[in-house]
Amino acid sequence: MARGDLEQISIGVGSNVQDGAVLHGDPGQPVRIGADVTVGHRAVIHGATLEDGCLVGIGAIVLNGVTVGAGALVAAGSVVTKDVAPGTLVMGAPAVVKRKLPPEAIEEQRCHAQRYARLAASHAQINR
C-alpha cells in the first residue's frame, strides 16, 4: 500500500513494490525509491530513501530519515534505523553491516528488479 496522505511518495523506473508492502511518510520525510529497486513482500518503508539498485527483503522495516545506499541489500526481517552505505549487506534488529557486496551481487539485484519490470510489461500486454 502506498499511503501518500502526509507526504509524497516517488517510485523510480523499473522498481517493484511487492504484495503487502507499505510505503508511508511523515511530514518532511517523504518516501523516495530510486530506479531498479525491489521492495519485498510485507516490507515497510517509512519516510525513507532507497537509492538505485537496492533490495529490501521480505518483512524488513526501514524507518524515518534512513537512506539505503545504491546497491545495498537489507536482509529479510531487518529493522533499519541508520543509513546504509552503498553496496553493503545489513541484517538484524537493529540492522548492522555484515559485509560489502561484490559487484556481481549488486548487478544481480538490478537484474532481479528488471525481471519484475519485464513481467509487469508482459501482463500489461496480455490484458489489453
PLM features: residue spans?
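Glycine-rich hexapeptide-repeat left-handed beta-helix
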Residues: 13, 19-20, 25, 30-33, ...
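Surface-exposed loop/turn motifs in large extracellular/passenger domains
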Residues: 8-10
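A short gly/proline-enriched turn/hairpin at secondary-structure junctions
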Residues: 4-5, 26
